[in-house]
Protein backbone atom coordinates (compact mmCIF):
# COMPACT_ATOMS: atom_id res chain seq x y z
CA UNK A 1 0.00 0.00 0.00
CA UNK A 2 1.46 3.39 -0.93
CA UNK A 3 1.79 6.24 1.54
CA UNK A 4 -1.06 8.75 1.35
CA UNK A 5 0.07 12.36 1.37
CA UNK A 6 -2.09 14.53 3.58
CA UNK A 7 -3.12 17.97 2.37
CA UNK A 8 -2.92 21.08 4.53
CA UNK A 9 -6.73 21.20 4.67
CA UNK A 10 -6.91 17.58 5.83
CA UNK A 11 -4.30 18.29 8.53
CA UNK A 12 -6.28 21.28 9.82
CA UNK A 13 -9.47 19.19 9.86
CA UNK A 14 -7.73 16.39 11.81
CA UNK A 15 -6.38 18.88 14.35
CA UNK A 16 -9.80 20.50 14.76
CA UNK A 17 -11.45 17.11 15.31
CA UNK A 18 -8.88 16.06 17.91
CA UNK A 19 -9.08 19.38 19.78
CA UNK A 20 -12.89 19.35 19.80
CA UNK A 21 -12.85 15.84 21.29
CA UNK A 22 -11.17 17.21 24.45
CA UNK A 23 -13.63 18.02 27.24
CA UNK A 24 -11.36 20.43 29.09
CA UNK A 25 -10.50 23.89 27.75
CA UNK A 26 -6.99 23.42 29.17
CA UNK A 27 -6.56 20.20 27.19
CA UNK A 28 -7.91 21.89 24.08
CA UNK A 29 -5.37 24.69 24.46
CA UNK A 30 -2.51 22.22 25.07
CA UNK A 31 -3.52 20.02 22.11
CA UNK A 32 -3.86 23.04 19.82
CA UNK A 33 -0.43 24.36 20.86
CA UNK A 34 1.17 20.95 20.47
CA UNK A 35 -0.26 20.32 17.00
CA UNK A 36 0.75 23.84 15.88
CA UNK A 37 4.29 23.35 17.17
CA UNK A 38 4.54 20.00 15.37
CA UNK A 39 3.19 21.45 12.12
CA UNK A 40 5.69 24.34 12.24
CA UNK A 41 8.55 21.90 12.87
CA UNK A 42 7.44 19.66 9.98
CA UNK A 43 7.26 22.71 7.68
CA UNK A 44 10.83 23.68 8.62
CA UNK A 45 12.19 20.16 8.15
CA UNK A 46 10.17 19.41 4.99
CA UNK A 47 9.33 15.90 6.23
CA UNK A 48 6.10 13.93 5.67
CA UNK A 49 3.28 15.36 7.85
CA UNK A 50 2.58 12.22 9.82
CA UNK A 51 4.81 9.14 9.68
CA UNK A 52 6.64 7.01 12.22
CA UNK A 53 10.04 8.34 11.14
CA UNK A 54 8.86 11.95 11.37
CA UNK A 55 7.32 11.45 14.83
CA UNK A 56 10.52 9.74 16.08
CA UNK A 57 12.63 12.63 14.77
CA UNK A 58 10.26 15.10 16.41
CA UNK A 59 10.51 13.22 19.72
CA UNK A 60 14.32 13.46 19.49
CA UNK A 61 14.06 17.17 18.64
CA UNK A 62 11.91 17.82 21.72
CA UNK A 63 14.24 15.80 23.93
CA UNK A 64 17.66 16.83 22.64
CA UNK A 65 17.17 20.29 21.14
CA UNK A 66 14.25 21.78 23.05
CA UNK A 67 15.24 19.84 26.21
CA UNK A 68 11.62 19.38 27.27
CA UNK A 69 10.73 17.26 30.29
CA UNK A 70 9.55 13.70 29.63
CA UNK A 71 5.97 14.57 30.64
CA UNK A 72 5.87 17.44 28.13
CA UNK A 73 7.24 15.23 25.36
CA UNK A 74 4.70 12.54 26.21
CA UNK A 75 1.91 15.11 25.89
CA UNK A 76 3.14 15.91 22.37
CA UNK A 77 3.28 12.19 21.56
CA UNK A 78 -0.26 11.73 22.88
CA UNK A 79 -1.52 14.46 20.56
CA UNK A 80 0.24 12.85 17.60
CA UNK A 81 -1.23 9.45 18.50
CA UNK A 82 -4.71 10.98 18.59
CA UNK A 83 -4.06 12.60 15.22
CA UNK A 84 -3.01 9.21 13.84
CA UNK A 85 -6.21 7.62 15.15
CA UNK A 86 -8.28 10.40 13.62
CA UNK A 87 -6.34 9.98 10.37
CA UNK A 88 -7.55 6.38 10.17
CA UNK A 89 -11.13 7.41 10.92
CA UNK A 90 -11.05 10.11 8.23
CA UNK A 91 -9.22 7.81 5.77
CA UNK A 92 -6.39 10.27 5.17
CA UNK A 93 -3.69 8.09 6.79
CA UNK A 94 -2.79 4.50 6.00
CA UNK A 95 -3.73 2.21 8.91
CA UNK A 96 -0.22 0.68 8.91
CA UNK A 97 1.32 4.16 9.29
CA UNK A 98 -1.07 5.09 12.08
CA UNK A 99 -0.42 1.81 13.91
CA UNK A 100 3.33 2.40 13.67
CA UNK A 101 2.83 5.84 15.27
CA UNK A 102 0.59 4.37 17.97
CA UNK A 103 3.35 1.88 18.89
CA UNK A 104 5.98 4.57 19.52
CA UNK A 105 6.87 4.24 23.21
CA UNK A 106 6.51 7.02 25.73
CA UNK A 107 9.65 8.77 27.00
CA UNK A 108 10.55 7.24 30.38
CA UNK A 109 10.11 9.51 33.38
CA UNK A 110 12.76 7.81 35.52
CA UNK A 111 14.49 9.80 38.21
CA UNK A 112 12.23 12.81 37.85
CA UNK A 113 10.34 13.73 40.99
CA UNK A 114 6.73 14.71 40.61
CA UNK A 115 4.81 16.89 43.03
CA UNK A 116 6.04 19.00 45.92
CA UNK A 117 8.80 17.44 48.00
CA UNK A 118 9.60 18.65 51.49
CA UNK A 119 13.13 18.82 52.85
CA UNK A 120 13.85 16.01 55.35
CA UNK A 121 13.60 18.36 58.35
CA UNK A 122 10.13 19.61 57.43
CA UNK A 123 8.88 16.09 56.75
CA UNK A 124 10.15 14.91 60.15
CA UNK A 125 8.43 17.83 61.89
CA UNK A 126 5.13 16.93 60.25
CA UNK A 127 5.44 13.29 61.26
Protein language model features and the residues they cover:
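N-terminal core-binding DNA-recognition domain of tyrosine recombinases/integrases
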Residues: 12, 16-29, 35-113
